[in-house]
Amino acid sequence: QGTPVVDVCIYYGTGIEKRIQYKQDSALMDLGYQYDYVNSDVILNQMSVQDGKICLPNGISYELLVLPEESGISIEVLEKIREMVYDGATIVGPRPICSIGLYKSTEIDRQIKSITNLLWGELDTPLIDRTVGNGKIVYGKNIDQILSEKKIEPDLKIENRDSNFSLDFIHRRNKEYDIYYLANLREEAIDYATLSFRTSGKVPYIWNPVDGTVIEQRVYVDDGERTHIPCSFDPYGSYFIIS
C-alpha cells in the first residue's frame, strides 16, 4: 500500500532493446537512494514538473532524470526534456549528438544540435552544471553528489555496523505512514547496525512479515530530521519498519 518513494529515474533509451544495465544505478542502492527505470513512453506521455520534481500521474515523483551514456536520442524525447528543464527539472547525462528512430535525418540532427546547444551549452566539456530556465543540466558529477547539492539526504543510511554489508529496501508512503521493507540478502546474520531513515516525528513499529507480530520500537533517536534505529537481521531475514 502507499506510493513508492523514489529519488531517481533512469531513462533506458535504447538499452531496453539491448537488455543493458546502466552503470549509473550500480551504487545507488548502497548509497541509500531508490531508483526506477523509465522508457520513452513514460517521458513523453506521463511526466510533468511541479516544484522542481518530476511527477507521474500515479503520485510518484523524482528529483532527477538520468540519461543513458548514448549519443543518440529521439527528437520527441529531447523536446520533452527541454520542456521539463524549463519547467524546473534536473536532468543528468551526456549531450546527445544525433537522432534515432524512424525520422532520423540530417535536418533532425540539426534540430538536436540546436536544442542541445541551448541545454548543454555550445562547449563540450567533461563537467557541466548549467541552469536553464527553472531547471538544470548536469553531467560529470556523481548522482549522490547532485542529490546532496539539492539537499536530498539518502533515504536509508547504514551507520554503525558490525560488518560490511548492504540491505535491500523499499520505501512507500501513504497519508498516515512511512513503510520501509528491509531485507538482508546474505546467508550471514547481521548482529548489529544502526539504520537512519529519512523520516521524523513518528514512533516506529517493527512488523515481522513471517508471523505478523507488530512491536513498538522503544529504542530509537529522532533528531528532528532523521530517525535512527538499532537493528539486527537473521540470515536472509527481513521485516517492515512502519512509522
Give each language-model segment a name.
Residues 1-243:
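Carbohydrate-binding surfaces of carbohydrate-active enzymes
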